[in-house]
Amino acid sequence: MCIRDRCPIPEGAAGVCKVRFVEGGRLHVPWGYVGGVQCDPIEKKPFFHAHPGALAYSFGMLGCDLHCGYCQNWVTSQALRDPRAVVPPTDAAPAALVADATRLGARVLVSTYNEPLITAEWAVEIFRHARAAGLLTAFVSNGNATERVLSYIRPHVDLYKVDLKSFDDRHYRQLGGRLDPILFTIRRLHEMGIWLEIVTLLIPGFNDGEDELKRLTAFVASISPFIPWHVTAFHKDYNMSDPENTTPEMLVRAAAIAREAGLHYVYAGNIPGRVGDLEDTRCHHCAAVLIERYGYLIRSYRLTPSGTCPDCGTAIPGRWSVAFDGQIAATPFLPGTRRLRTV
C-alpha cells in the first residue's frame, strides 16, 4: 500500500520513510514494536473539541517521510535517518497496549510521535483492539497521505490532527514533501467525516508572514469555518537553532488573521496563560465561554450533554462526551517516565 505519492520502491530498497521496504518482490511494513508510549491529557495532542479532559494513550514507532529541521520528536521520527537519534524499539502486542491504556484510565489511543501514516497497518491492528475495548482512536500526522491510505484507515480512526506546516510549497520541499498532498488530505478527512483539527507551528522567518497566514487560514475556512485551528509556539530544537522562539504577541497576531479569515475556533498554544482567551472555547454564536483552559488543564466546562451552548442552545462542532468526566483540578495529569510492559 502506497502511503504517499511519488515514492516507488525498487527491489532491495526502502522508501523515503526508511521503514517500508521491498524484499523478494514483497512490500514489508513496520510491525510489533513501539518506540515510545505515554499517557497525557488529550489537549496535549492537541484536540480541543474532542472529549476534553480525557486521557490519551499515545504510542509511536520509528521513522518519518519528512525531515523537518525543527522536529520536536526527532529522536523517534529521524531514528533511521540521523545517527544521533537512537531509540531502542520495545516489542509490543496490540492487546498489551490496549490493556496498559485501560489500566491508566485512557479513553483514546493515539498513533503519534513518528509519522503514523507510514506505520498505518500496525496502528489499524491496535485500533481494532482498542475499538473492541470501547476506546476511541486518533492519528497525529503530517497529513502527507493518498486516497488509498485514507480509505484504509477511515473505518478505524475517530479523530485526526494534521500539522499544516506552511502554505508555501517551497517550504514543504525543504522538509521533504509538497503542499498539495497535505491540502488534499485535509479536504478528504473533512469529507469523510473524521473529526479534524489542524495545527500550525509558527516559526519566525519561516511561515509567519502575513500573506502566508492569510492564505493558510483562508484555505482552512474554505473547507469549514468550524475546523479548530491551533497556532503553536516554536522553540529551538533539533537542527533549527537560528530563529528566535515564538512570542505570545506573534501567536495573538496569527490568531487575529485567522479570525479575520472567518475561522470560529482559533487557539494559541504552548505558552499557557500568556495569550489572553485563546486557550478557551467560546460559543461561535453568543461568545459565551464554554471551556476554560490553562495549558492542558481544564478549569471549567459548561457544554451541555448534547454538546450545545448552555446560554443560547447553539450546537458546538466537535466530538463531546455525554457527561464530562475529565479533570478539573489544581494540576493536570502528570505522566510518569515508565516504559510499557508488554506480554
Features from the language model and the residues they span:
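Short metal-coordination and nucleic-acid-contact micro-motifs, chiefly zinc-binding Cys/His arrays
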Residues: 13, 55-64, 279, 302-305
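Conserved Radical SAM active-site core
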Residues: 22-159, 328-335, 343
